[in-house]
């Protein structure tokens, strides 16, 4: 049995009148198919001919009296006919039947079971067709079969289908992207399907698309997908590992559409409310503060919204984030900034007291923060991020005696040195300082050695070389 999350119907309507799929479906409904010619050429049986002809003439009454035959006929036609225009017509007819009455999904499941036919196979096969309408209408029907009935999609088929949806979302200039997103919105309302989507690296795909410029409708649909994922406490706890908060904070700051604002606030609220570990909720609050969400909330507080949910969420988030700021230690602030990947010259970086007290904490959780700094040095193109990362690594080595050894083990020393030739002068400068710190084991030891050297020179003794 599928366990679908209850959501207001206005949020999950299946008919988007402006979508390409619906516009084409409206044209296809007006077609007349010559079923007699199919029977005469023995491409369909007489039984199927009578059923589909009767269904064309009086859908509701014939279906009510001959439901099993209708299901059998439609599955036969989808499986055995190949002409694009005919398949398009059958798919629209079938989709309309399901849209008119959701209980018909179970009718299809039950009848297919009695006939020992696989209900998934014919439609999964159609996903490989060249015709975009056939592919996406088949996908839409699969989503309804998977979400509206008592049977869930088998695991192997599920992984194939979710991978298909993910690939379609990521496809450049896909005119059916709203329809693809609509199917995913449906699928992720079922808890059993959420982990499977994460398993095909689906969240990363959503975030990657949201980080590009997409129209507000697709933006809303994809954030909706993130929202329904956050209703699962385990997924809500893991969500910001994918940088969900920074991406949504950016969208919120530029957002002009109320529906997009509403769904982002709902995601943020779930990221605080749903995780069972309070420390995770705290981390999410800190991440939101780091991403300047409080500033956006203060702007939203000045606006009037007809939607009471927005007002309630703004009040809730403002209170939670204000409380987290009061409890925020300098290391919490630093760790959140590093995890966000958005390094800037915030005060903690230049604080000698901070590094004296906290350098060793970069070793926590198997050197998590240090690994992130090295990764940013390796992957970021932003000069400020690179400069700050070089500086932080230098301070870590300076204040933690074994820092040089640890950094070498992580491959960080070589990466820092590569930036000595960076095109940006600030990056070159910070990389040079970091390398100088890397060449010395212990700054206090070096200072003492220099004092001894000066003393010996005064006494005429040979100088003592500092360790490099």
Swiss-Prot record:
The gene is VhaSFD. GO terms for biological process: determination of adult lifespan; lysosomal lumen acidification; proton transmembrane transport. It comes from Drosophila melanogaster (Fruit fly). Keywords: Hydrogen ion transport, Ion transport, Transport. Gene3D superfamilies: Leucine-rich Repeat Variant, V-type ATPase, subunit H, C-terminal domain. It holds the Pfam family V-ATPase_H_N. This is V-type proton ATPase subunit H. Subunit of the V1 complex of vacuolar(H+)-ATPase (V-ATPase), a multisubunit enzyme composed of a peripheral complex (V1) that hydrolyzes ATP and a membrane integral complex (V0) that translocates protons. V-ATPase is responsible for acidifying and maintaining the pH of intracellular compartments and in some cell types, is targeted to the plasma membrane, where it is responsible for acidifying the extracellular environment. Subunit H is essential for V-ATPase activity, but not for the assembly of the complex. Belongs to the V-ATPase H subunit family. It comes from the Eukaryota. V-ATPase is a heteromultimeric enzyme made up of two complexes: the ATP-hydrolytic V1 complex and the proton translocation V0 complex. The V1 complex consists of three catalytic AB heterodimers that form a heterohexamer, three peripheral stalks each consisting of EG heterodimers, one central rotor including subunits D and F, and the regulatory subunits C and H. The proton translocation complex V0 consists of the proton transport subunit a, a ring of proteolipid subunits c9c'', rotary subunit d, subunits e and f, and the accessory subunits VhaAC45 and ATP6AP2.
